[in-house]
Amino acid sequence: MITLSKSQEEVFKKLAVELSMSKLIEACNKSVDFSSLNSNEQLDVLKVTNAFYRSAEQIINDSTYDAFLSEFSTYNPDHPYLLTVEPEVLADSKTVPLPKKMLSTDKAYSFEEIKKWIDRLLKAAIEVGVSESEIQIKVTPKLDGYAAYDDGISLYTRGDGARGQDITRAFNKGLQVANNGDRGLGPGEIVIKKSYFDTVLSDKFENSRNIQAAIIAEKKVDESIQKAIDVGACVFFPFLSLENWIGHYTEILVDFESIVEKMWSAVDYDIDGVVLEVTNETLKEHMGATRHHHRWQIAFKVNAESAEVKVLNVTPQTSRTGRVTPVAELEPTKLSGATISRATVHHYNMVKTNGVGPGAIVQLVRSGLVIPKIEKVIKAVEPQLAKECPSCGTHLIWESDHLVCPNKTDCPAQTENTLVHFFKTLGNNDGFGPKVIEKLHEFGIKKIHEIYELKQESFVSFGFGDKTAQNLVEQLQVSRDVEIEDWRFLAAFGVSRLAGGNCEKLLQHHSLDSLFEATVEDLVQLDGFAQVSADAIVEGLANIKEEFLKLSALNFNLTITPKASEKSPGETPVFGKIIVFTGAMTQGSRGDMEKQAKALGAKVAKSVTGKTSLLVTGDKVGANKINAARDKGVQVLSELDYLALISTY
């Protein structure tokens, strides 16, 4: 039952909202449905609960606030409260302009919303001629601390995003930058290590926000908080210094949950989601921002429920790469409408250091992610470590935080997961999931090319029905006939450090066949490939070469990645230019002309902007479109004039 403390009552009175205190309490206790309140009452609930949160007097959890906010935005999508940074309620001291605006972050609560955001990125990339191969996404933990900006001289609160309060006194109290970092790295958050809070301060403080508020307050801090500052448990963590994952946008689409899980476990601080942002500066500039948030960035948040659960057993599972993942078998527990009986532990070093084994009590969280997650260990026991691969029985070895099966050739789990990965990455077929692959492996199928050699009667002899067997044979043909990119075909082989984005980069400089002759020295000369990656890629390519050649002989319908121009800027008249093709072309398809332009070093966009260099017009192009382009300073050429321009290249 939620009630207001005296300090919360004081905050409530200062806000002078029309909402009654009793109705606020009813809404927070959910004894009255938030949706039954009128818009003004809903807004007051949001204002008050936000004020409590920012004053270290949190009255409802984040997921409840987000649910209220979502309900309000459904019927008031253009309300100013939603279009600006949520107001900060801190003491009555004066505000000063921030060195740089600190906007809020747009939020997503499902994978579908993330996919829509990526669609917007792709559309924007076309508009400014950014190649899909250049669209990299950075993912970082979304810290749940106190937002601030450090310009190297002063520290400021976020305030309303444009003006904040000077809280440099926090550094004067001894607050350090995380990881002994430098001052002046811009936006970040004041946070406290979860492990320190849980073991040292949780008995004295209800939550870490109380401590963060004390650090920025004008008065002297409590002795226990000062100690936390002195030992580096309380820090200012610049976003630039955060652990991060960077990869091609297609990897987000294929492996979203595991990337989120990795970032969720990357820091020893409270987090309430992950932040995704595009790294291409041209794309960032083009997408811009609203008054509330940057369009090139989004936070994936989860409305989570948790429970304390007993561990019954820790079961090892071997992945495609040989890493063995620990899975905690749990006492069946109802959480977020589902009965949970197992959850993945990030890696075996976590099992070892946190004491996860039979009898351990863990805090289990289930949220918008399908996969339940162990948030922390409440009661540690003797850790249960695997000694042998559960699939092939090979003795496991340690590689950093992971236990690994070194049996790369005869481990059933590695073989089956490799086969599944191939068909999943191609993405142009249906039917070859884990169960089908497992059955094929039982009958001795270990290589991808062996699957393509199977006839309908072979599938029937393995126990598949006639219709299923016929469908599988048809799907194998479909996977060869339906056009796919050559970089996606290469990525399907699962070479370490060679996911979709890196595959496309390499194929801009090497053909599929010549790539296998590339040396480590060749790769490190290319932008984005360090020594460690190059070593792993060259070794991985050597390992798959025989299998690759057998599959290549099956004549998959591959779209060839255009090669990066080897000509200098002076050798081609369109090098570096942004070109838009419009109208019906008579000398070839528009697609062919776009590919040719890219091969000559140009960037191709779909619509004219102020950054467009050249508009090439075919038949049936309106005068208004041509005049609008010229008004923007864009050069306009007919199809024939353009072909004459590039005719010697």
From Swiss-Prot:
EC number(s)?
A: 6.5.1.2
Q: Which cofactor does it need?
A: Mg(2+); Mn(2+)
Domain BRCT intervals: 569-649
Q: Which reaction does it catalyse?
A: NAD(+) + (deoxyribonucleotide)n-3'-hydroxyl + 5'-phospho-(deoxyribonucleotide)m = (deoxyribonucleotide)n+m + AMP + beta-nicotinamide D-nucleotide
Keyword Ligase set for record: yes
Task: Name the positions where NAD(+) binds.
Answer: 62-66, 104-105, 158, 189, 301
Highest taxon of source: Bacteria
CDD domains the record matches: BRCT_DNA_ligase_like
Which organism was this protein described from? Psychromonas ingrahamii (strain DSM 17664 / CCUG 51855 / 37)
Report the family membership. Belongs to the NAD-dependent DNA ligase family. LigA subfamily.
Q: Which Pfam families match?
A: BRCT, DNA_ligase_aden, DNA_ligase_OB, HHH_5
Please list the disulfide bridges. none
What this chain does, per the entry, is described as: DNA ligase that catalyzes the formation of phosphodiester linkages between 5'-phosphoryl and 3'-hydroxyl groups in double-stranded DNA using NAD as a coenzyme and as the energy source for the reaction. It is essential for DNA replication and repair of damaged DNA.
Q: What is this protein called?
A: DNA ligase
Active site (UniProt): 142 (n6-amp-lysine intermediate)
